[in-house]
């Protein structure tokens, strides 16, 4: 049975990757279908009720700069906003928001339902239709076939998902949802390497049974940050506090006593869990010398009593979970509303993907999110946007696009995955980016919005706001460079009290701002130097561009050197055994990874600069030197 319409792009799955993929393809004008097993759970925050953080906030800003929905939804759902690393340099500052689950889901669903070119249909997908290595559609659980030349799979933890609580386990995509068994079996037939990963979630606690007076209060920032470049503080709902408590030796004894019934430590779970978000069992085992671990007590929303205790993800049996929770200060009488659990699921080796996130084996088939071995809403959303965009470009007959490592954290993410692969759930950090001084949260729009407009991702309202901001920044920089003050100027009397060393020669306003003791806000408040920019985002940009100009210029020069051969393409059909001069080790690694570019090849462990030189000579001799898109 065939559906009566044909689509340009089909997206399977309605989580963070799927929603961004569907919205991106539809914004670009492609007739798009989003298939989900349950329309009510579109945009569901399956684990922690928070968006952003170190590295992750950078991805959210990049999604936003390209017209995505995550940051906008966060502004409407965020019940506590904080800027992390605020005392450090701008490269590592990151926005994090505690979100109301219901408000977030509601906003995402509202955006989806009002997006032109997007159709939503409730059915689980069981099969792919593939003809001559080209995807041509999907088949749902009820045997209904949908036709499309481009399919984006964003299956999350649903592929052969297995939920573990103690030594008991059962099939599930997440708590309360069925797994995708038939689709997982179908995908295992494809020539793509498959593995198993694991993630987990903590028990949810009833706030009415917690004694918050024994915990440290953690308030949000003032003034309040916003997540979206189009956001406004007026969009935020009521703001509330989170709380901090700690485990103790008694907690650790309870956990150690239950390890014989832990699926992780009894060999029941095969999948590898996230290194940077370990279960409480893992923490106690790996950091045996620590007498306590911090726990963040995070509300799940404004109209629910559920609390997310961030830091005690566990798959221990329920009785052990209850005892360990009640051993924690402030939770002596706590009641669990939902037990914690671990979930194992299939993922596919991302080295079998192009950097467009299209599979190398099947034309038109794209993967995004946890299916590629990542963990986190933000990583999923960023991949979803890229996959949906490239699926749309493909059906329009246009070249694929992916930002380079020096252009976006999204570029770092995709390059790491498609070049190096991953054996454990991959999480983004600022430390993964070698050019992080240029890849800041504050300039994500300056880096990406013009490209997003060119690709068709950015609407008129965002483009107008961005253009106005860009113009105001440039005009203000010109003003600061063009206005001068000299030692005999009448402005000196107001200026010198704010300087560590009074000026002894003529100086531009720009030079004054570059002084360590001066910032833009302070300079603009001095008589004769204002008025400054009213837009805080534009003002921040002016300050950073002035104060860090030398460092930024130096990093840009490094990038210019590095990218000379970065985008030189490598044919996917190239057999590296045919390249004279390469060692057997290098041949094996290159044939295994099948890098798309010289840049990717150079980042594979064991590929030496000498091997890269040999490759470049071989390509030149064979007339194969070409620049990748």
Swiss-Prot record:
SUPFAM superfamilies: FAD/NAD(P)-binding domain. Pfam families: GIDA, GIDA_C_1st, SAM_GIDA_C. GO terms for molecular function: flavin adenine dinucleotide binding. GO terms for biological process: tRNA methylation; tRNA wobble uridine modification. NAD(+) binds at residues 273-287. Belongs to the MnmG family. NAD-binding protein involved in the addition of a carboxymethylaminomethyl (cmnm) group at the wobble position (U34) of certain tRNAs, forming tRNA-cmnm(5)s(2)U34. NCBIfam families: mnmG_gidA (TIGR00136). This is tRNA uridine 5-carboxymethylaminomethyl modification enzyme MnmG. The gene is mnmG.
């Amino acid at each position: 049975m065939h559906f009566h319409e044909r689509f340009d792009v089909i997206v399977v799955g309605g989580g963070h990757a799927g929603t961004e993929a569907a919205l991106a393809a539809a914004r670009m004008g492609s007739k798009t279908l989003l298939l989900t097993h349950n329309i009510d759970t579109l945009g569901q925050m399956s684990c922690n009720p928070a968006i952003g953080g170190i590295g992750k906030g950078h991805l959210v800003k990049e999604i936003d700069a390209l017209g995505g929905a995550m940051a906008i939804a966060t502004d409407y759902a965020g019940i506590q906003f904080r800027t992390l690393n605020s005392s450090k340099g701008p490269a590592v500052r990151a926005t994090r928001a505690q979100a109301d689950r219901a408000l977030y889901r509601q906003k995402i669903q509202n955006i989806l339902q009002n997006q032109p070119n997007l159709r939503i249909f409730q059915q689980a997908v069981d099969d792919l239709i593939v003809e001559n290595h080209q995807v041509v559609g999907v088949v749902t659980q009820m045997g209904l076939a949908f036709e499309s030349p481009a399919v984006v799979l964003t299956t999350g933890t649903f592929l052969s998902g297995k939920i573990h609580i103690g030594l008991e386990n059962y099939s599930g995509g997440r708590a309360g949802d069925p797994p995708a068994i038939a689709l997982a079996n179908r995908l295992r037939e494809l020539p793509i390497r498959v593995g198993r990963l694991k993630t987990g979630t903590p028990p949810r606690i009833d706030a009415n049974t917690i004694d918050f007076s024994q915990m440290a209060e953690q308030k949000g920032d003032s003034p309040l940050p916003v997540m979206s470049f189009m956001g406004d503080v007026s969009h935020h709902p009521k703001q509330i506090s989170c709380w901090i408590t700690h485990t103790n030796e008694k907690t650790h004894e309870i956990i150690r006593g239950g390890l014989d019934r832990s699926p992780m430590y009894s060999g029941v779970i095969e999948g590898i869990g996230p290194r940077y978000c370990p279960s409480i069992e893992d923490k106690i085992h790996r950091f045996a010398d620590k007498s306590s671990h911090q726990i963040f007590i995070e509300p799940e929303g404004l109209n629910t009593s559920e609390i997310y205790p961030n830091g005690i993800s566990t798959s221990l049996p329920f009785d052990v979970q209850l005892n360990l929770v009640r051993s924690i200060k402030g939770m002596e009488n706590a009641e669990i509303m939902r037990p914690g659990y671990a979930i194992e699921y299939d993922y596919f080796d991302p080295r079998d993907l192009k950097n467009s996130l299209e599979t190398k084996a099947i034309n038109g088939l794209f993967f995004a999110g946890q299916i590629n071995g990542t963990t986190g809403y933000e990583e999923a959303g960023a991949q979803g946007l890229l996959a949906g965009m490239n699926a749309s470009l493909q059906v329009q007959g246009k070249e694929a696009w992916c930002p380079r490592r020096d252009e976006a954290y999204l570029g770092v993410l995709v390059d790491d995955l498609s070049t190096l692969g991953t054996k454990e759930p991959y999480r983004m950090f600022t430390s993964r980016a070698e050019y992080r001084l240029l890849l800041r949260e504050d300039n994500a729009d300056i880096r990406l919005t013009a490209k997003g407009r060119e690709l068709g991702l950015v609407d008129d309202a965002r483009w107008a706001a961005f253009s106005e901001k860009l113009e105001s920044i440039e005009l203000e920089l010109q003003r600061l460079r063009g206005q001068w003050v000299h030692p005999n100027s009448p402005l000196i009397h107001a200026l010198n009290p704010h300087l560590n060393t009074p000026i002894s020669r003529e100086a531009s306003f720009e030079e004054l701002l570059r002084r360590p003791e001066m910032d833009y806000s302070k300079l603009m408040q001095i008589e004769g130097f204002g008025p400054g920019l009213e837009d805080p985002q534009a003002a921040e940009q002016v300050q950073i561009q002035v104060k860090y100009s030398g460092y930024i210029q130096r990093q840009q020069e490094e990038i210019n050197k590095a990218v000379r051969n970065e985008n030189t393409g490598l044919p996917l059909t190239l057999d590296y055994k045919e390249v004279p001069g390469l060692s057997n080790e290098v041949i094996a690694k290159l044939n295994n990874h099948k890098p798309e570019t010289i840049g990717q090849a150079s980042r594979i462990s064991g590929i030496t600069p000498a091997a890269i030189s040999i490759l470049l000579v071989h390509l030149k001799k064979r007339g194969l030197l070409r620049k990748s898109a």
